[in-house]
Amino acid sequence: MNNNFSRIITLLRKERGLSQKKAAEDLGVSQALLSHYEKGIRECGLDFLVRCGDFYGVSVDYL
């Protein structure tokens, strides 16, 4: 996984003016789990990568 994944998903969320809570809800995960992904505490699975790409309108490769 791209080492910048945490930074990228945080930036994409903030660029869209979304709170962590709202983004997590829309992505189907808890706010705590999204926070862990954004801080790099946990690595996500392929299914979450695909959902992020679809949600933010970017390719999985970009993430």
PLM region spans:
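Alpha-helical residues within the helix-turn-helix
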Residues: 14, 25, 54
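Short, conserved catalytic or interaction motifs in soluble domains
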Residues: 39
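Short alpha-helical DNA-recognition segment
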Residues: 17-36
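Residues that mark the N-terminal boundary/hinge immediately upstream of a DNA-recognition element
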Residues: 8, 19, 45-48, 59
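A short, Lys/Arg-rich alpha-helix, primarily the initiator
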Residues: 1-16
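DNA major-groove recognition helix of helix-turn-helix/homeodomain DNA-binding modules
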Residues: 28, 47-62
